[in-house]
């Protein structure tokens, strides 16, 4: 890696400690990975691995999935943000086109994050205060 190194065990711990969910879809539109954090927003089952991403979304949103993938592959767009209110939470969902150094499309990263707590922040917290 150009900026350091870590073991697979360390990488797994990093991916599962991040305070958001991640799902990776490869250039062939197959789901290849999802993080397994303690508080996943959208539950994932290993059965989705290697499945076409279009079969992982409700039929009503299939055209949106197709549009995002088409725009990412063509280079027209590099990210697609959404936010929804569900179950009393504000969820931010962002899709990012992953590209190599030549700009070639490698796949899509979906990042989902419960931002409810951030929306309530006021002022500063400059002194250490652990959440109990």
Map each language-model feature to its residues.
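Generic surface-pattern signal
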Residues: 16, 20, 58, 70, ...
């Amino acid at each position: 890696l150009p900026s350091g190194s870590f073991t697979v065990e360390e990488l797994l711990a990093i991916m599962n400690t991040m305070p958001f969910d991640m799902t990776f879809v490869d250039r062939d539109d197959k789901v290849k990975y999802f993080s397994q954090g303690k508080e996943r927003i959208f539950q994932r089952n290993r059965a989705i691995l290697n499945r076409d991403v279009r079969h992982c979304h409700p039929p009503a949103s299939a055209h949106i999935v197709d549009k995002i993938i088409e725009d990412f592959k063509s280079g027209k767009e590099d990210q697609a943000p959404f936010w929804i209110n569900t179950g009393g939470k504000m969820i931010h969902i962002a899709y990012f086109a992953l590209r190599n150094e030549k700009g070639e499309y490698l796949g899509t990263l979906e990042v989902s994050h419960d931002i409810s707590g951030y929306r309530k922040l006021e002022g500063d917290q400059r002194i250490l205060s652990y959440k109990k």
